[in-house]
Design a protein with these regions (language model features):
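Non-globular targeting/processing and membrane-anchoring segments
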Residues: 2-116, 133-136, 143, 150-237
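Short His-Asn-centered micro-motif
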Residues: 85-86, 120-126, 131, 147
Length: 237
């Protein structure tokens, strides 16, 4: 359709949703809402099944934190539950994975997890001094630990040079158990960026998405901000 100026003059061809009257719009929205509610109920059922997963006992791993070596059981800081994001790491690189950087930069206030007896932290294969320097460089607010000298990362599916992972743990005394793991698109529901973008008429504007003809589309992830951009965002605040 043609975009229009304030006085109604056509300016250029622009991919846009069709214009309809209010009742037609409300009917289309109601039809979509039925599907959204069904998806929400299915997600509730999946979460219920997740709560019923068994767990596996882990060895007594030792990671490296800002204050030195720390047992995995102590990373919980007294909490019963722990979520770990295994951040990708490329040795010797100034700028690390932009996807991991962007994903973890969303989480600036995690105190709300206290009420749920839980923590959320980052573990990476990078040496702790380099990891903490990178955390500061990009303005990341999460707590970081290193698995560079521990088999923990590899055992959790995030070996040196490997991809990102999300792992969830449960603690009974000093014994830690692994309860859940996901990776790839399984992490999207943990992010607010994708749900926000998916509300937009154009969506993520990526080639794989099912969009109307003429909608802007680019290679997958091409719209993501670079790690350098997150550093600039941090400097601006």
């Amino acid at each position: 359709m043609s975009a229009q100026t304030a006085n109604g003059d056509a300016t250029e061809e622009l991919a846009a949703p069709p214009v309809v009257d209010q009742p037609t719009w409300e009917a289309a929205l109601a039809e979509l809402r039925t599907r959204e509610k069904a998806a929400t109920r299915e997600l509730d059922a999946i979460a219920a099944a997740r709560r019923r997963l068994p767990m596996v006992e882990l060895p007594d791993y030792v990671l490296e934190g800002a204050d030195g070596p720390i047992r995995l059981a102590d990373v919980f800081e007294g909490k019963r539950q722990l979520i770990v994001y295994n951040h990708m790491w490329f040795p010797g690189e100034t700028w690390q994975c932009p996807g991991c950087t962007g994903f973890t930069s969303q989480f600036t206030r995690l105190e709300f997890l206290d009420s749920y007896d839980a923590r959320f932290v980052i573990v990476t294969q990078g040496p702790i001094d380099e990891a903490l320097a990178y955390k500061a460089r990009v303005g990341n607010k999460m707590t970081w630990y290193s698995t560079a000298d521990s088999p923990f990362g590899t055992d959790m599916g995030a070996p040196p040079g490997g991809g990102f992972q999300v792992n969830v743990f449960f603690r009974i005394g000093d014994t830690v158990y692994r309860t859940y793991n996901t990776q790839g698109r399984g992490t999207e529901q943990l992010s607010y960026s994708f749900p926000l973008i998916d509300l937009l008429p154009y969506g993520r504007q990526e080639e794989w998405q099912d969009s109307p003809e003429g909608w802007p589309q680019s290679p997958t992830y091409s719209g993501w901000a670079s790690s350098e951009a997150y550093a600039r965002y941090a400097e601006a605040t």
